[in-house]
Amino acid sequence: ETSFVSANSCENGVSYRTYVGGVCGFNGEGGHSFTDITSNIDVKGSTCDVGGLFGIAHYGNNFVNCSSSGDVEIYAADDIDSAEEIGGIAGVWHNENGTTVTFTNCSFTGTLKTNITEGVDLSNNTITGKAYSSTGTGNLIIK
């Protein structure tokens, strides 16, 4: 049986960003390296930013030899955009200030599931979900 982590970010009918992952929900920006991380943890989050290892992968960080095999689920997304903020390694990647988020030799063998299915495409979310940005600058590199 697999271990699990679950986070609910809804209170009094208001939804907030969930930021939950099997290892870390929110990692800070700039120059951190996460190397040789393996997890078999099921992760459930209520609204968005739900990943097998990290809820959000911030700009300037590098992820090397990371793998996740647990199931990842968003169970109360408010809309299609929130439902697509799910990923096998990171729920979203934050591109800001023209910097790069890099994933090298990372893999996911679990399943992705969200409460909204119509109009939601998770086929490219095995490493990370969609970009979350206020400026639209920055890059995602997956090797």
Predicted segment positions?
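Surface-exposed loop/turn motifs in large extracellular/passenger domains
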Residues: 1-143
